[in-house]
Amino acid sequence: MAVKLLMTWDILPGREQEYFEFVVRDFIPGLQGLGMEPSDAWFTMYGDQPQIMAAAQMSGMSSLQTILDSSDWEGLIQQLLDFVENFDYKVVPARSGFQM
């Protein structure tokens, strides 16, 4: 069964430009290099929710778990944490459209 990795975070104040450059140049290609398929990205304009929600899809939980247990994943997230705070993620069964 296909699964989706749902990730949320807030961009650190004053780091917005560097953050967007990192996401385009390193984070998205990094996810793809790990075997994930980026599928969604959402920006929260109003409300008390994480500023960014991004999703990546995988064919199954076992392949995703292998990635989440890898040092490459840990390194990619450590780089992301230079630009964001309140990083969190969860795994859900994949379906089309917006998922929380």
State where each predicted segment sits.
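Active-site-flanking beta-strand signature of metal-NTP-handling nucleotidyl enzymes
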Residues: 3-10
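Short, surface-exposed ligand-recognition loops at beta-strand->loop->(often short) alpha-helix junctions
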Residues: 10-22
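Residue-level signal for secondary-structure boundary sites
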Residues: 15, 62-64, 97
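An amphipathic, aromatic/His-enriched active-site/gating alpha helix that lines ligand/cofactor pockets
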Residues: 24-39, 57-92
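Short, solvent-exposed loop/turn elements at beta->coil junctions and helix N-caps
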Residues: 41-44
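Short, low-order "capping/linker" segments at domain edges
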Residues: 92-100
